[in-house]
């Protein structure tokens, strides 16, 4: 089976990819989206979102990374897709699933689900702009406010020449509500298409991954939020390994505070450590206590000192 690390805007950036791929066995990471409007973006934009481009499109530990584009105009998606692969990206991905109001308001992400023809035109333009030996993938949801167009959406992706399709098993309107996950619908799409379909949504552990694959028939999954809840989730999902012990999680957080974010204004670690702890609290009781301690801290040095002060030896 393949396990992919999902793109999560404002969460899974290059530093977190570096940390997570060191302790996991991901087959591929997809970047946060590069927003494409009406121009060919400068090289520095791609390098900011995906610094791994300067390392043969791999994280420091060797996991492949693919640049994701978000936009609606085929010409500019094509030109920026070509630039991404020229810079070294291992293929490109088209975002047709992001539910963010800001993104949808500008005509990108899940908005494309309303009109599968836009998905077809965007993916086709990207496919034609990218050398045939490199993959072009598309990430979608089941629809905007219903699943009525799910087959039309899937057909558009395949007919555009995409290499593979990632399906999040909910509509845009359903957001991330657990009760709405529909792995069966993903399976219906998989049966319809000839290209590989990757299942996404509500995969939190080995059992849920097995259930998802059994219901959908997919042999590959993409995980997002769960990868932050359990930092070694790909190994849990692939090999039924136990979740990472809390002392190892703390060591990961300590390393995170030592990594420098390029062009950081001094608030990067403040926001991101608190954000990560809020995910960890769902799996580790110890994270709640640590979160209560750091949530009142408002600058990176204080956050770093608080995390670094934890004696891992006493946790074992």
UniProtKB/Swiss-Prot annotation:
Residues that bind FMN: 7-9, 68, 139, 200-202, 224-225
GO molecular function: flavin adenine dinucleotide binding; FMN binding; tRNA binding; tRNA-dihydrouridine16 synthase activity
InterPro entries in the record: Aldolase_TIM, DUS-like_FMN-bd, DUS_fam, DusC, DusC_C, tRNA_hU_synthase_CS
Claim: tRNA processing is one of the keywords in the record: yes
Superkingdom of source: Bacteria
Keyword Cell division among record annotations: no
Cofactor names: FMN
Coiled coil: none
Alphabetical list of Pfam families matching this protein: Dus (PF01207)
Keywords assigned: Flavoprotein, FMN, NADP, Oxidoreductase, RNA-binding, tRNA processing, tRNA-binding
Active-site positions on this chain: 98 (proton donor)
EC number: 1.3.1.-
Interacts with tRNA, annotated site positions: 35, 95, 176, 272, 274, 279, 295
Enzyme class: oxidoreductase
Function: Catalyzes the synthesis of 5,6-dihydrouridine (D), a modified base found in the D-loop of most tRNAs, via the reduction of the C5-C6 double bond in target uridines. Specifically modifies U16 in tRNAs.
Family affiliation: Belongs to the Dus family. DusC subfamily.
The protein's name: tRNA-dihydrouridine(16) synthase
Originating species: Escherichia coli O157:H7
């Amino acid at each position: 089976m393949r396990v992919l690390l999902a793109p999560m805007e404002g969460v899974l950036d290059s530093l977190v990819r570096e940390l997570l791929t060191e302790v996991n066995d991901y087959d591929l990471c997809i970047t946060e989206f590069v927003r494409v409007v009406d121009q060919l973006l400068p090289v520095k934009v791609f390098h900011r979102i995906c610094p791994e481009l300067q390392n043969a499109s791999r994280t420091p530990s060797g996991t492949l990374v693919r640049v994701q584009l978000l936009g609606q105009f085929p010409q500019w998606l094509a030109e920026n897709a070509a630039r991404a692969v020229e810079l070294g990206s291992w293929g490109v991905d088209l975002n047709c699933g992001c539910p963010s109001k800001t993104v949808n308001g500008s005509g990108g992400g899940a908005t494309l689900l309303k009109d599968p023809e836009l998905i077809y035109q965007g993916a086709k333009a990207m496919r034609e702009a990218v050398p045939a030996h490199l993959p072009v993938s598309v990430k979608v949801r089941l629809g905007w406010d219903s699943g009525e167009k799910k087959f039309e959406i899937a057909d558009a992706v395949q007919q555009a020449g995409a290499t593979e399709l990632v399906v999040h098993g909910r509509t845009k309107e359903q957001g991330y509500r657990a009760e709405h996950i529909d792995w069966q619908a993903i399976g219906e799409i998989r049966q319809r298409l000839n290209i590989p379909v990757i299942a996404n949504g509500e995969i939190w552990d080995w059992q849920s991954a097995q259930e998802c694959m059994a219901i959908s028939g997919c042999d590959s999954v993409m995980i997002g939020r769960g990868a932050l809840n359990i930092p070694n989730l790909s190994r849990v999902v692939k090999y039924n390994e136990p979740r990472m012990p809390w002392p190892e999680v703390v060591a990961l957080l300590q390393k995170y505070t030592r990594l420098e974010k390029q062009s950081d204004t001094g608030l990067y670690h403040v926001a991101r450590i608190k954000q990560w702890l809020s995910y960890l609290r769902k799996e580790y009781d110890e994270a709640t206590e640590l979160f209560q301690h750091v949530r009142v801290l408002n600058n990176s040095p204080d956050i770093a000192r608080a995390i670094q002060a934890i004696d891992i030896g006493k946790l074992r």
